[in-house]
C-alpha cells in the first residue's frame, strides 16, 4: 500500500465529523485509515511509512497474518475476551505518538499500534486491521461490530 492523492473534500471533513461525534457522545468505530484519522484529529501523529519498522507483514487484506496483543482492562479486551488475536493487515502508515486522551489497547509483534480507544467516551475504538473482512468466520471480530451496534442503540 501507498499514499493516494489527497482528497480535498474528505481529508478536511473527516476530523471535523469525528470531533462532532465525540462532542455529541455518539459511538465511533474507526478502522484502518480511521484509527490514523482519530489519532491525528485528537492530537497524535503517524509514522508516514512503516517499512523501516516492519518485522511482520502489513499487506494482506484477507488472511490472518500477524498476532496482536490486546492490553487488559481496555474496551477492546472486554469485547474480544482474549489477550491475543490474529489479524489481517493492509497499511503502510501507523499511529506513532498516541493522542492525549486516548489509550493504547493493542500492539503488533513489531510494536505497531493496532488499537486505541478513548475511555471517557461512550464508545470510541480504533483498530488498524480490518475486522469486517474477518467477522464472518471469527466471532471475536464480529464482537467488535456487535459492541458498536449495541452502543449505537
Predicted regions and their residues:
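Hydrophobic, aromatic-enriched interface-forming segments
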Residues: 35-37
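Conserved G/P- and acidic residue-centered "switch" motifs that form tight phosphate/ATP-binding loops
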Residues: 32
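Acyltransferase
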Residues: 127, 131-153
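Anionic-ligand binding region
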Residues: 48-75
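Flexible gly/pro-rich beta->alpha loop and the following alpha-helix that scaffold active-site loops
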Residues: 1-29, 42, 47, 51-52, ...
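Catalytic beta-strand/loop cores that center a nucleophilic Ser/Cys/Thr
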Residues: 73-120
Amino acid at each position: 500500500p501507498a499514499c493516494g492523492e489527497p482528497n480535498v473534500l474528505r481529508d478536511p471533513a473527516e476530523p471535523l465529523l469525528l470531533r462532532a461525534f465525540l462532542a455529541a457522545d455518539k459511538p465511533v468505530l474507526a478502522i484502518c485509515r480511521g484509527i490514523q484519522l482519530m489519532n491525528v484529529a485528537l492530537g497524535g501523529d503517524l509514522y508516514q511509512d512503516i517499512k523501516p519498522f516492519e518485522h511482520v507483514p502489513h499487506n494482506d487484506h484477507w488472511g490472518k497474518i500477524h498476532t496482536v496483543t490486546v492490553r487488559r482492562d481496555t474496551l477492546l479486551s472486554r469485547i474480544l475476551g482474549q489477550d491475543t488475536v490474529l489479524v489481517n493487515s493492509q497499511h503502510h502508515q501507523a499511529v506513532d505518538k498516541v493522542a492525549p486522551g486516548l489509550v493504547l489497547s493493542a500492539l503488533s509483534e513489531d510494536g505497531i499500534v493496532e488499537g486505541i480507544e478513548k475511555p471517557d467516551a461512550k464508545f470510541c475504538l480504533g483498530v488498524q486491521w480490518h475486522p469486517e473482512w474477518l467477522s464472518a468466520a471469527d466471532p471475536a471480530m464480529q464482537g467488535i461490530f456487535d459492541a458498536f451496534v449495541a452502543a449505537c442503540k
